[in-house]
Amino acid sequence: MPTIQQLIRSGRSIKASKTASPALEKCPQKRGVCTRVYTTTPKKPNSALRKVARVRLSNKIEVTAYIPGEGHNLQEHSIVLIRGGRVKDLPGVRYHIVRGSLDTSGVADRKQSRSKYGAKQPKAGAAAPVKGKRR
């Protein structure tokens, strides 16, 4: 605990808040190029093959980003858009790839939460999505 004299001399320092996604540099999204697309396994107790990509951003920083949704068309040299948001069971993955923008296709046959996965509205002739459960 500082003395009164020490507080007069220097005052209390304000603790700087640390950002969860430093590579974005206060931008909502950043563009990047995939350098490697691969699968990795999550922490215990989960078990899966999670799809991730190593991305070199436009500010020359290289990050690991998660590819959400079922199936993707990404490969090396694909241009992607990155947003913040970590994946809890993948250590070191702090970013998500935005589906349906730049070289990333939207998730095919997606009926619900379409805007999060870049899926277009299904055609009127096709089976309409169920609005609410009827009893």
UniProtKB/Swiss-Prot annotation:
Pfam families: Ribosom_S12_S23
Biased composition (Low complexity): 116-135
Gene Ontology biological process: translation
Cellular component aspect of the GO annotation: small ribosomal subunit
Protein name (Swiss-Prot/TrEMBL): Small ribosomal subunit protein uS12
Entry-linked InterPro entries: NA-bd_OB-fold, Ribosomal_uS12, Ribosomal_uS12_bac
Disordered: annotated span: 101-135
Alphabetical list of PANTHER family matching this protein: 30S RIBOSOMAL PROTEIN S12 FAMILY MEMBER
Subunit composition and interactions: Part of the 30S ribosomal subunit. Contacts proteins S8 and S17. May interact with IF1 in the 30S initiation complex.
UniProt similarity note: Belongs to the universal ribosomal protein uS12 family.
Entry-annotated residues carrying 3-methylthioaspartic acid: 89
Role this protein plays: With S4 and S5 plays an important role in translational accuracy.
This protein's UniProt keywords: Methylation, Ribonucleoprotein, Ribosomal protein, RNA-binding, rRNA-binding, tRNA-binding
NCBIfam families: rpsL_bact
GO MF entries: rRNA binding; structural constituent of ribosome; tRNA binding
